[in-house]
């Protein structure tokens, strides 16, 4: 294989490489054997057409595209490795020569990993705004939240207040004309929940069951239904029931209802205190790690971050987001219709985050390289076993999904993050 690389501009260039006849000939034979199985040529049994007759009738060149498709991926990968390049985006491939009996010549316009000039990344001083101490108020808030989850709604005769739930029928109209989606029956609405258009819930406060209220509201200018945005509407609203939240008493029985593993309220408080302490400690560690890495990134200089890297990160994030939605039964078209957004809006939403994440990844990789971090076979095996346990998979499944190089990369990244974080001090 002949390989050359020509820089065109920062982080961009043209990689030229060849695929030799030593590789082409056996692949031609393989492709021919596969193709001839489906050929029907008069005078020959199906699948038994001699190669010379095929070449004469169809031409050897008719096999070239299949041969190229088979050989190109490995040839490109080998050329990148031989040229010592770190390519960070899909190449633009051009086959410049496919002459019979000659080595094939291919060019690839590639984007390479930008140079990272590291600044200080060890012994950093960082600030974090996360409290480690668990207060009595923290414990009480946790218990109160669980207590409210066990609350029951009971019908009340008095007028509705914020925090109550009302059961209503409503019919909306604009200039006396009803509109789609503006009608509901026996709808349970929590007053103060913000479920409805701003101003709707407030106008029901002070009213009782059996009353009919004309609720006048204006749809927000950015409302998802453009035909309603900015318009004033009247909702004729009939209140059927007013319900108040009734919370259980704060006692040992409540504690047992919340958590069957405890016997008393004191036990529950102690359990929650330990859980909150562990959670706060974890949050504190995460905050220190985030602050230390952010500082290391700020101290570094990245020479012209390629747009392609950011685009690929945006694409990955968008696909991950939409994939999660689909697993919940929400397809992309439904999501965009509900939110009144577009695919482009979603890409723009992830743009800044993608740029930040790309810079962070580059700096951490540069730290790992500068420190000469590597991963032993023992460390790789331990990582595989840990991933298998985390995702409830067989070890062999993990090994099939992740290459040794991918695992080695992840391990060295973890080492770099640990170095940056463990040497940092909090102001």
From Swiss-Prot:
Keywords attached to this entry = Cell cycle, Cell division, Chaperone, Cytoplasm, Isomerase, Rotamase
Q: What catalytic reaction does the record list?
A: [protein]-peptidylproline (omega=180) = [protein]-peptidylproline (omega=0)
What is its EC class?
Answer: isomerase
Select a single GO molecular function from the record's annotations and give it.
peptidyl-prolyl cis-trans isomerase activity
According to its UniProt entry, the protein's GO biological process terms are: 'de novo' cotranslational protein folding; cell division; chaperone-mediated protein folding; protein transport; protein unfolding
Please tell me where this protein is predominantly located.
cytoplasm
Write down the superkingdom of origin.
Bacteria
**Where is this gene product found?**
Cytoplasm
Q: What is its EC number?
A: 5.2.1.8
Q: What does this protein do?
A: Involved in protein export. Acts as a chaperone by maintaining the newly synthesized protein in an open conformation. Functions as a peptidyl-prolyl cis-trans isomerase.
The family assignment reads: Belongs to the FKBP-type PPIase family. Tig subfamily.
Protein's UniProt name = Trigger factor
**Native source species:** Streptococcus pneumoniae (strain JJA)
Its taxonomic placement starts with: Bacteria, Bacillati, Bacillota, Bacilli, Lactobacillales
Q: Which gene encodes it?
A: tig
């Amino acid at each position: 294989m002949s390989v050359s690389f020509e820089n065109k501009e920062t982080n961009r260039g043209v990689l030229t490489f060849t695929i030799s006849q030593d590789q082409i000939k056996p692949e031609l034979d393989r492709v021919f054997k596969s193709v001839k199985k489906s050929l029907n040529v008069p005078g020959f049994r199906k699948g038994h057409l001699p190669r010379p007759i095929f070449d004469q009738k169809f031409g050897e060149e008719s096999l070239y595209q299949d041969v190229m498709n088979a050989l190109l991926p490995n040839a490109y990968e080998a050329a990148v490795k031989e040229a010592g390049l770190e390519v960070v985006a899909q190449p633009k491939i051009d086959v410049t020569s496919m002459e019979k009996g000659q080595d094939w010549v291919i060019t690839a316009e590639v984007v390479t990993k930008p140079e990272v000039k590291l600044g200080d990344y060890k012994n950093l001083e960082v600030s974090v705004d996360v409290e480690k101490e668990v207060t009595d108020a923290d414990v009480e808030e946790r218990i109160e939240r669980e207590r409210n989850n066990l609350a029951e709604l009971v019908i009340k005769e008095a007028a509705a207040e914020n925090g109550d739930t009302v059961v209503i029928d409503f019919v909306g109209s604009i200039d006396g004309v009803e509109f789609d989606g503006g009608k509901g029956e026996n709808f349970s609405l929590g007053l103060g929940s913000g479920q409805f258009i701003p101003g709707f819930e407030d106008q029901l406060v002070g009213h009782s069951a059996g009353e009919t209220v004309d609720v006048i509201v204006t749809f927000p200018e950015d409302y998802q239904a453009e035909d309603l945005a900015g318009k004033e509407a009247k909702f004729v609203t009939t209140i059927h029931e007013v319900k108040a939240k009734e919370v259980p008493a704060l006692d040992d029985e409540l504690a047992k209802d919340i958590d069957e593993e405890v016997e008393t309220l004191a036990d529950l408080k102690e359990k929650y205190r330990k859980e909150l302490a562990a959670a706060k400690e974890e949050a504190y560690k995460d905050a220190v790690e985030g602050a230390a890495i952010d500082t290391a990134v700020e101290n570094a200089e990245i020479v012209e971050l390629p747009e392609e890297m950011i685009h690929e990160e945006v694409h990955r994030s968008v696909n991950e987001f939409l994939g999660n939605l689909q697993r919940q039964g929400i397809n992309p078209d439904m999501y965009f219709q509900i939110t009144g957004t577009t695919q482009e809006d979603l890409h723009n939403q992830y743009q800044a985050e993608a740029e930040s994440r790309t810079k962070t990844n580059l700096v951490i990789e540069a730290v790992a390289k500068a420190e000469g971090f590597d991963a032993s076979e023992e460390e790789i095996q331990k990582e595989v076993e840990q991933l298998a346990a985390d995702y409830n998979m067989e070890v062999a499944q993990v090994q099939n999904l992740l290459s040794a190089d991918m695992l080695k990369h992840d391990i060295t990244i973890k080492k770099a993050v640990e170095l940056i974080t463990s040497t940092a001090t909090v102001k």
